[in-house]
Amino acid sequence: VLDTNVFVSGIFFGGPPSQILKAWQKKSLQIVLSKEILVEYQRVADELSFKYPQIDIMPIIELITIHGQFIDTEGLDISICEDPDDDKFIECAVAGKCDIIVSGDRHLLKLVWHKGVKILKPRDFVDQYLRL
């Protein structure tokens, strides 16, 4: 599961978030998300596209819509994050039986680990899982 900051940073700014998206595009990893997460990805990417009009977000949004692994989180109500908006990432990871959430969000990173789900910064994820 990628939090919105990581997904959008991968599109607009490069660095480890971009490496993660490229690995996903090469099918080296799977991105798990919920409809609620996709809506947030789209909203934040749309906002940034006004600031960076040279970047076309539609191809990656279409790819994630088609090739992302969607998980139904309906009925789950995990309230653990300081910022309740971040709970959707925990819910998605738990429902999807994911091992990792990749996040730069301080509220999520404070948790470190929840119900078998590790929370890693993008650089740590790249170093631990994408380096050969």
Report residues per predicted region:
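A secondary-structure boundary/capping signal
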Residues: 3-4, 33-34, 104-105, 121-122
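Residues at secondary-structure transition points
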Residues: 15, 32, 55, 80, ...
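Membrane interface segments of multi-pass transport proteins and intramembrane proteases
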Residues: 50-51
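Short, well-structured alpha-helical segments
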Residues: 54-65
